[in-house]
């Protein structure tokens, strides 16, 4: 689950490729809209890049990851905090009920962006076992330029690591598809930053490169 396109790649791109290699069906739900939204006076109150560019990037990213399907939930970008929470919860819950996922990845609770905060709150309300029994595990990912810029709140402390040593370059290549979000160092979303974070998480977990996650829920059974 990504508040915005590219969050999934920054947060769990390598892990997505590992799921695909294992033969898992992987879906992407993008919470916010690429549409231009206007008020009654025809003034733009919300926009997300150029819609043509964004749709092109989404098409390319779907093919690159070979997602089973991308769900566009069409909530307004940067305005989730003033959008009725029930509407967001309902759209996420409907998506979960359609695909019945076993594992969900979503942002960490420590990101600065309000869209990320609301996405976490809305998604977690859908993960109660009696609402969606298929869910076994829920993990929070970190997003460069959001998670690492929370200098005064709670800090992201990964307690789950996934070895992405064989998929780090593919993660970088996926991020390059988002041309307007990907820039040269020292921009937070750069090749150097992505690789450096993966190497750091790898050094914490005994891998050459890794992605770190915050474990929200684990309902795994012990055989």
What residue ranges belong to the model's regions?
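Short beta-strand segments at enzyme active-site cores
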Residues: 29, 70-73
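Metal-dependent de-N-acetylase/amidase catalytic core
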Residues: 1, 18, 22, 45-49, ...
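ATP-dependent adenylation/pyrophosphate-handling site
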Residues: 1-5, 9-47
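A short, flexible beta-alpha/helix-coil linker loop
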Residues: 34-36, 75-78
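Short, conserved clusters of charged catalytic residues that mark active-site
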Residues: 10-11, 53, 87
């Amino acid at each position: 689950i990504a508040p915005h396109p590219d969050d999934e790649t920054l947060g769990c791109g390598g892990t997505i490729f590992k799921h695909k290699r294992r033969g898992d069906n992987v879906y992407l739900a993008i919470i916010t809209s690429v549409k231009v939204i206007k008020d009654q006076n025809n003034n733009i109150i919300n926009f997300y890049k150029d819609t043509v560019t964004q749709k092109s990037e989404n098409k390319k990213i779907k093919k690159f990851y070979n997602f089973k399907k991308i769900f566009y939930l069409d909530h307004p970008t940067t305005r989730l905090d003033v959008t009725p929470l029930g509407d967001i919860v309902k759209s996420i819950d409907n998506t979960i009920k359609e695909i019945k996922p076993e594992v969900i990845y979503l942002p960490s609770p420590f990101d600065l962006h309000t869209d990320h905060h609301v996405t976490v709150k809305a998604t977690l309300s859908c993960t109660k076992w009696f609402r969606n029994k298929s869910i076994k595990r829920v993990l929070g990912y970190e997003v460069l330029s959001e998670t690492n810029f929370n200098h005064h709140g709670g800090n992201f402390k990964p307690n789950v690591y996934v070895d992405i040593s064989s998929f780090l370059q593919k993660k970088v290549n996926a991020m390059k598809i988002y041309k307007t979000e990907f820039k040269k160092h020292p921009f937070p979303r750069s090749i150097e930053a992505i690789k450096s974070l993966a190497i750091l998480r790898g050094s914490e977990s005994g891998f050459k490169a890794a992605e770190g996650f915050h474990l929200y829920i684990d309902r795994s059974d012990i055989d």
